[in-house]
């Protein structure tokens, strides 16, 4: 487990850096940044350098997803505010005046009963394919799980206690009750898990799944379960996979949905199709007494 924030607290003297950024070729800019880091520090010589860079990239992606989520929420609020004046503009008589046709109707009017409380069962996941709670939120893709925990502004890494084991996570501030403390839905790879403090006000924990072909129904034991049928894998993630791996992932997702709906999975469908072809090719054979599993 690596702690990224520790390298941020002891900062050496500042080194000037200038470079032009071409949006069509961001990798070139990153290469220049890494060249400067390699020349001006020993960071790239560390054994954990690659892992820490990957964790920083994942943290940046998480911030981008959260920004997009907030943007969508603002747009939905604006659309609701636009609709409200339209309703308010209706005159009282227009709202209260019953239609003559309804008074002449002979059939009894069907009144929709008020909806009862939400049925217990899986919950629709958030935009990150996880859930939002009062003290933290989590999201996932097939390979990783990300947990974000808001902290008081100015929080330092030395004030945080974070213990990541194969099947359990403990996170909180030293001297206080743990914020997250429980067993994972499934095991993780501790050596490929990281935590970091973003802007001194957010603990971000990155977990690498042991089984990277399964969606987690919850992050920590005791949480409500999400409906894994409603998860939305990132298109870019699937596009980055090689054809064989992508086909396996899509097959797994299809089988998972079929299983939850009580429908046949892909291998069962394939067997039935093969049997139909065989029967069609051998019309003279009698299959009436045959038993099929």
UniProtKB/Swiss-Prot annotation:
Gene behind the chain: BOB2
Positions carrying N-acetylalanine: 2
GO biological process: response to stress
Cell location: Cytoplasm; Cytoplasmic granule
Disulfide bonds: none
Any Pfam family hit: CS
Organism: Arabidopsis thaliana
Extent of the signal sequence: none
Source domain of life: Eukaryota
Any GO CC annotation of this UniProt entry: cytoplasm
Function: Small heat shock protein required for the establishment of auxin gradients and for patterning of the apical domain of the embryo. Involved in the specification of the cotyledon primordia. Also required for normal inflorescence and floral meristem function, normal developmental patterning and thermotolerance. Acts as a molecular chaperone.
Basic and acidic residues compositional bias, start-end: 67-102, 110-120
Classification via SUPFAM superfamilies: HSP20-like chaperones
Keywords: Acetylation, Chaperone, Coiled coil, Cytoplasm, Developmental protein
Residue ranges of domain CS in the record: 131-220
Broad class of the protein's primary localization: cytoplasm
Stored PANTHER family: NUCLEAR MOVEMENT PROTEIN NUDC (PTHR12356), PROTEIN BOBBER 2 (PTHR12356:SF32)
Keyword Cytoplasm: yes
Coiled-coil region: 50-80
Expression induction: Up-regulated by heat shock.
Region feature Disordered, mapped onto this chain: 67-125
Descriptive protein name: Protein BOBBER 2
